[in-house]
Structure formats: structure tokens, C-alpha cells
């Protein structure tokens, strides 16, 4: 299903999530994926406001810098989703973007609903443990402008490097094709 209206998108996502069955132990995992600047973080926040039992995990906390996309996809499965599926504690090492190094370990609370938002959240081996995949997209120029507004001038040197990683991941994984919902966030 392709959606463009924000209210319609939230309503449809809530419907799909409500119908979903857990595939990660007792936890229903919702991946909110798509390229940078598509609006995944804002969309996850809007869903979380309406889903009080949900915990939001941001992939930005898992990327080991600007070249860490592929490793973060693996870490999402190995450190978060697989342990949850086994009924174990999930924890991951947060990336400190300011100091360009790993920071403290974070432990996820036990939750019936986990929203994982960010590039790569619906890719890789973790996809088998996710109940819902929501894909957000926007025109490249719109996404670029949002990225600059969000991250400032510091983002510019990294935009193309990151975009190459995104494109390779999404092509190899066919992430968009597997989505339960596709939402275009372009104005």
C-alpha cells in the first residue's frame, strides 16, 4: 500500500501494527526503514505517542560512524533481536558521534512492542524476526535538505558516502519490496 497523507499513514500503520503477531519471542518488532531524511525518526515518535507500550530503538545509536551501516544491521540482529527472541536481555553499545567512538552499553527494557527506526532497521537477518516493515521515502532533494537542516553543515561531506551504503544495502536486501507499508513523505 502506498500512502502520502500523514494522518492516513499513521492510521494505517497503527492498523497494521495492531494486526501483527509477535515474531521475536513475545515481542512485536516494527521496523521503520528507508533512506536518510525520509522522516523515520519523526514517524516513529508519532507512532510511539499513540502506542504507550512501545519502546523506540534508534539505529543512529548503533551505527559505528559514517561507515557503520552494514555492521549496525548485523548488530541489530545479534545484539538486540536474537536475544529478545530467545527471551534474553538485549543490549548494544551506543555510538558516540561527537567523539567518534563507542560509548556505554545500553540495555533494552522488556517490551511487548519494539519500534526500530533508521536506515537498515528492516534489512538483514533481523527481518525474519520483525512483524511489520514500514518504508518511508521522499525525493532525493527533499531528503538532502532535511539532512542539512537536521545535521547542519557537518553532514555535507558524509551525505554521498552514506547514500552509497544505503543504496547498496537496499538493493541487496530488497527492503522496499518487502514493506507492509510504503509512505512517501515528500511535500
Predicted features along the sequence, with ranges:
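Extreme N-terminal, non-catalytic leader segments
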Residues: 1-29
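Hydrophobic anchor at the beta1->P-loop junction of P-loop NTPases
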Residues: 32
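P-loop (Walker A) phosphate-binding loop of NTP-binding proteins
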Residues: 35
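Conserved lysine of the Walker
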Residues: 40
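Hydrophobic positions on the alpha1 helix immediately C-terminal to the Walker A/P-loop
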Residues: 43
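Conserved nucleotide-sensing/catalytic segment adjacent to the nucleotide-binding pocket
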Residues: 55-57, 62-114
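Small-molecule kinase domains that catalyze NTP-dependent phosphoryl transfer to phosphate-bearing small molecules
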Residues: 101, 105, 123, 152-187
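ATP-dependent NMP and nucleoside kinases share a basic, alpha-helical "lid"
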Residues: 104-151
Amino acid at each position: 500500500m502506498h500512502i502520502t497523507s500523514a494522518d492516513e499513514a499513521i492510521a494505517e500503520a497503527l492498523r497494521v501494527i495492531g494486526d501483527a503477531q509477535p515474531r521475536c519471542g513475545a515481542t512485536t518488532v516494527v521496523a521503520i526503514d528507508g533512506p536518510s531524511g525520509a522522516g523515520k525518526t519523526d514517524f516513529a515518535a508519532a507512532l510511539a505517542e499513540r502506542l504507550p507500550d512501545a519502546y523506540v530503538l534508534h539505529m543512529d545509536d548503533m551505527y559505528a560512524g559514517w561507515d557503520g551501516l552494514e555492521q549496525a544491521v548485523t548488530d541489530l540482529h545479534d545484539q538486540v533481536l536474537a536475544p529478545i527472541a530467545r527471551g534474553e536481555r538485549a543490549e548494544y553499545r551506543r555510538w558516540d558521534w561527537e567523539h567518534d567512538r563507542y560509548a556505554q552499553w545500553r540495555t533494552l527494557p522488556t517490551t511487548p512492542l519494539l519500534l526500530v527506526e533508521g536506515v537498515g532497521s528492516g534489512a538483514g537477518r533481523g527481518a525474519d524476526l520483525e512483524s511489520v516493515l514500514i518504508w518511508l521515502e521522499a525525493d532525493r532533494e527533499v531528503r538532502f535538505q532535511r539532512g542539512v537542516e537536521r545535521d547542519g553543515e557537518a553532514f555535507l561531506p558524509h551525505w554521498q558516502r552514506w547514500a552509497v551504503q544505503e543504496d547498496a544495502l537496499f538493493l541487496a536486501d530488497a527492503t522496499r519490496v518487502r514493506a507492509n507499508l510504503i509512505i512517501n513523505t515528500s511535500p
